[in-house]
Amino acid sequence: MSAVAEIIQTEMPAPFVFTDSAAAKVAELIAEEGNPDLKLRVFVQGGGCSGFQYGFTFDEITNEDDTTMTKNGVSLLIDAMSYQYLVGAEIDYKDDLEGAQFVIKNPNATSTCGCGSSFSA
């Protein structure tokens, strides 16, 4: 009797979610800048009233330790240190009565401040 091994390939879930809304806004901002090499860098740094805060910037350079996600032709970069705090997070863009802004829904945050710009983990 011969043994047949069945290999089942499953797609690994993405480490974070980059929404269509966020990708569309980033594409719009990159078009305004006129530099197609720009990528959105999302990072975590110390600060804020809860200990950590999120930051957003444009970057032309992808570092060796960056995690990259591309959606609708737009690239999002997260450095290795920030990655551990953002695993499972959703990076979104909201434009509603409260204003227009990038929003991070982070399941790793144990608490957030009232303004939502800082968190503790």
Curated annotation (Swiss-Prot):
<dbReference type="InterPro" id="IPR035903">
    <property type="entry name" value="HesB-like_dom_sf"/>
</dbReference>
<dbReference type="GO" id="GO:0051537">
    <property type="term" value="F:2 iron, 2 sulfur cluster binding"/>
</dbReference>
<protein>
    <recommendedName>
        <fullName>Putative iron-sulfur cluster insertion protein ErpA</fullName>
    </recommendedName>
</protein>
<feature type="binding site">
    <location>
        <position position="115"/>
    </location>
    <ligand>
        <name>iron-sulfur cluster</name>
    </ligand>
</feature>
<dbReference type="GO" id="GO:0051539">
    <property type="term" value="F:4 iron, 4 sulfur cluster binding"/>
</dbReference>
<feature type="binding site">
    <location>
        <position position="49"/>
    </location>
    <ligand>
        <name>iron-sulfur cluster</name>
    </ligand>
</feature>
<dbReference type="Pfam" id="PF01521">
    <property type="entry name" value="Fe-S_biosyn"/>
</dbReference>
<dbReference type="GO" id="GO:0005506">
    <property type="term" value="F:iron ion binding"/>
</dbReference>
<comment type="subunit">
    <text>Homodimer.</text>
</comment>
<dbReference type="GO" id="GO:0016226">
    <property type="term" value="P:iron-sulfur cluster assembly"/>
</dbReference>
<feature type="binding site">
    <location>
        <position position="113"/>
    </location>
    <ligand>
        <name>iron-sulfur cluster</name>
    </ligand>
</feature>
<keyword id="KW-0411">Iron-sulfur</keyword>
<keyword id="KW-0408">Iron</keyword>
<comment type="similarity">
    <text>Belongs to the HesB/IscA family.</text>
</comment>
<dbReference type="InterPro" id="IPR000361">
    <property type="entry name" value="FeS_biogenesis"/>
</dbReference>
<comment type="function">
    <text>Required for insertion of 4Fe-4S clusters.</text>
</comment>
<dbReference type="InterPro" id="IPR023063">
    <property type="entry name" value="FeS_cluster_insertion_RrpA"/>
</dbReference>
<keyword id="KW-0479">Metal-binding</keyword>
<dbReference type="InterPro" id="IPR016092">
    <property type="entry name" value="FeS_cluster_insertion"/>
</dbReference>
<dbReference type="InterPro" id="IPR017870">
    <property type="entry name" value="FeS_cluster_insertion_CS"/>
</dbReference>
